[in-house]
């Protein structure tokens, strides 16, 4: 089955479009307009924090982190949203290994489905910031201005990490009806089973 891809309407829609792609992968059709509103999109676009807030509003559990290539490759449950080329968001949905090389499969709202070799992927994903932790921003109980807090969170220089937003659907995600969909259709059932696909494969084997 081909991994979903939705094209962004303009350059500011990459974040909401990436979330729309993952929602559809898990069986839920949500309109771009609704996600744009939940992401608090503005003339500059959207932040990772805005995408995280929107994802949690529709029933995902999220974790925004700075991770190494090895962590993304070996530990992260895909698909996830990553910060791309410092000004864009895309979905990583598969990492494969063939003939001694790693290949990263991306659903990009700007250009569609594309496969990258490790070198090209890392050159676009690894950033010059370190110590990114979205929970520090969310738990800002002292009322520190967001611009200042972001500056503190994104401080440091390290080209070994990239930003990723990991998403896990909760029961709330499946309980809420999406836009223009039949809740109990095949897509809904398939999406509900996706988080457990590894266990299903083990049972079938």
Explain the meaning of each model-derived region:
Residues 1-9, 16-205:
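Membrane-integrated ABC transporters
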């Amino acid at each position: 089955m081909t991994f979903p891809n939705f094209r962004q309407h303009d350059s500011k829609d990459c974040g909401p479009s990436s979330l729309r792609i993952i929602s559809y992968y898990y069986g839920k059709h949500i309109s771009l307009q609704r996600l744009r509103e939940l992401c608090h999109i503005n003339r500059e676009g959207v932040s990772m924090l805005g995408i995280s807030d929107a994802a949690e509003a529709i029933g995902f559990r999220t974790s925004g982190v700075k991770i190494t290539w090895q962590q993304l490759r070996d530990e992260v449950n895909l698909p996830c949203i990553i910060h791309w080329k410092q000004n864009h968001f895309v979905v990583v949905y598969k990492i494969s290994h063939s003939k001694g090389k790693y290949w990263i499969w991306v659903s990009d709202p700007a250009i569609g489905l594309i496969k990258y070799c490790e070198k090209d992927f890392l050159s676009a994903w690894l950033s010059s910031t370190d110590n990114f932790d979205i929970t520090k921003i969310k738990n800002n109980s002292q009322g520190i201005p967001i611009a200042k807090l972001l500056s503190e969170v994104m401080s440091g220089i390290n080209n070994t990490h990239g930003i990723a937003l990991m998403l896990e659907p909760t029961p709330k995600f499946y309980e809420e009806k999406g836009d223009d969909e039949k809740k109990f259709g095949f897509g809904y059932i398939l999406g509900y089973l996706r988080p457990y696909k590894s266990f299903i494969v083990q049972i079938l084997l």
